[in-house]
Amino acid sequence: AYRKAAAENPALERIFVQERDQANVQMTLNAKNYLLAAEPKGNLYGALYSVLATDDPNQRKSMHYIGSCIGRAAYLLDKAESFSRDKDKGRYNVFLLNGINDRNAARENARRQALAAVNDLVRAYGMLDVKLNRTLLDNIMILGLRHAIEPLDAESQPVQWLSLIHISEP
């Protein structure tokens, strides 16, 4: 799939290589800033999502921002999940560099930051001019992200997802 996408859109391949190299620099420098550490994945997702937009520059900008928010959340959640392995093997992990020494604390930190990214995403998503399948997209973008971010334990504070956006009637 990667080769096909790269053949169809060489600019995406250049962005992928550039952001991979930037991620390696962040790891080499032991970046402690969460936003800076997540930026390469956010940029990559932003580029991928902007390709899905119409030719309208505002729609393209919104889709880029949506992708960057998803990339930022994905990076942080991934680093929280790999926390124990990274700690055991002495690998780079932004949570370890910030003095977090417990996997559950890393997961909660990632969850809070991912929720902030999703709040940003929801604002950009609300500005999209979706003509078809709005209800389907609402389910994917809102409920799907909720499932990915909100932990399944009963002690967590539930998020009022429907208050984050105004879901339009068909």
Predicted stretch roles:
Residues Y49, A74-L77, Y125:
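A structural signal for well-ordered alpha-helices, especially hydrophobic packing surfaces
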Residues V51-R60, L128, L132:
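Inter-helical turn/loop segments and adjacent helix faces that build the functional surface
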Residues Q59-R60, R134, D138-W161:
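Histidine/acidic-rich helix-loop-helix segments that form or flank divalent-metal centers
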Residues A5-V17, D21-P40, K61-H64, D86-M127:
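Divalent-cation-assisted or electrostatically stabilized phosphate/pyrophosphate-binding catalytic cores
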Residues K61-R85:
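Active-site alpha-helical segments that house and flank conserved acidic catalytic motifs
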